[in-house]
Regions:
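Beta-rich carbohydrate-recognition and catalytic domains
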Residues: 8-155
């Protein structure tokens, strides 16, 4: 099943970002403000808070190297994966950007899992696996994986 996801195509849509993504970004901002910079690595990508998982979407876009990664911002244990976002020009000094993806749609509500990033038609395009849980007649749950596409503004 292919699902098209259309994030942040212009500034107007950016103002209408999902509640989950807005919540994650606000939480990141609060945690970053409360974190002593001396506790963070100088030359290594790290999440602003929570659990960090797989690197994804390593790409060159708009003159910078972008690295996305799965992470759960609300806990230091595994949970519904979001995509964090960092950029660099030299592969040594990394700048943390706001979260890029949050599990906020029916097709990815159990998490935004592994994927890639490319540039297409001047847009940064994220292709990832969205995961949902499907309740079975016997009461058990089964995971369904959906291929998703997010079109970003590169910020």
């Amino acid at each position: 099943m292919t699902t098209i996801r259309n994030h942040y195509q212009n500034n107007q849509e950016r103002n209408n970002m999902s509640n989950m993504l807005e919540k994650a970004r606000k939480y990141e901002t609060e945690k970053i403000a409360a974190t002593d910079p001396q506790t963070k690595p100088l030359f290594h990508v790290s999440a602003p808070t929570g659990w960090i998982n797989d690197p994804n979407g390593f790409s060159f876009y708009d003159g910078q190297i972008h690295l996305f990664y799965q992470y759960h911002p609300y806990n230091r244990e595994w949970g519904p994966m979001h995509w964090g976002h960092s950029v660099t020009c030299d592969m040594i000094h990394w700048e943390q950007l706001p979260a890029a993806l949050a599990p906020d749609e029916e097709y990815d509500k159990a998490g935004c899992f592994s994927g890639s990033a490319i540039e297409a038609d001047g847009k940064h395009v994220l292709v990832y696996t969205g995961v949902t849980r499907i309740k079975q007649p016997d009461g058990s749950e089964q995971y369904r994986q959906n291929q998703c596409i997010a079109f970003g503004d590169g910020k």
